[in-house]
């Protein structure tokens, strides 16, 4: 899976295309096929290293992205949600490790994703 991440902290020029394993939804989780990701001020702090002490200690790359919009394409077994595969949805993503929204797919807790309002597209 392609994502935009950083292998070393810095300015916008530190962002690069990275390859990551495709994530899958587990129990209590929903996976989105990301169509849009906002640039949240927190994403800048992840990119420049200001949040390094608060991030998981996984090795880089770090993938920013707190806000995502797209389509639900996988729901973890036993997940309690009103969402269905194919629904347009929006999510708040906690950017720990490589789980930010600047990626082709993102997995989030079901409680962090909602159906997009009618007429809204990513």
Locations of regions flagged by a protein language model:
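NAD(P)H dinucleotide-binding glycine-rich loop of Rossmann-like/cofactor-binding domains
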Residues: 57, 66, 92-122
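Short N-terminal binding/cap micro-motifs at the start of the first secondary-structure element
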Residues: 10-17, 41-42, 80
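Extreme N-terminal starter segment of soluble prokaryotic enzymes
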Residues: 1-2
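Cytochrome P450 core scaffold surrounding the K-helix E-X-X-R motif
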Residues: 42-48
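Glycine-rich beta-strand-centered segment in the early N-terminal region that forms part
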Residues: 21-38, 51-95
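Extracytoplasmic/periplasmic beta-strand context in beta-sandwich domains
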Residues: 18, 87, 103-104
């Amino acid at each position: 899976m392609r994502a935009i991440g950083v292998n070393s902290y810095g300015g916008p020029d530190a962002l690069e295309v990275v390859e990551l394993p495709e994530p899958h939804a587990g129990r209590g989780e929903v996976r989105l096929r990301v169509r849009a990701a906002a640039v949240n001020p927190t994403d800048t702090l992840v990119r420049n290293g200001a949040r390094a002490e608060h991030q998981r200690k996984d090795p880089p790359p770090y993938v920013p992205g707190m806000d995502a919009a797209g389509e639900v394409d996988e729901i973890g077994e036993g997940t309690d949600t009103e969402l269905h595969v194919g629904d347009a949805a929006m999510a708040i993503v906690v950017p720990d490790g490589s789980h930010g929204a600047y990626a082709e797919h993102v997995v989030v807790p079901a409680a962090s994703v909602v159906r997009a309002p009618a007429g809204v597209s990513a």
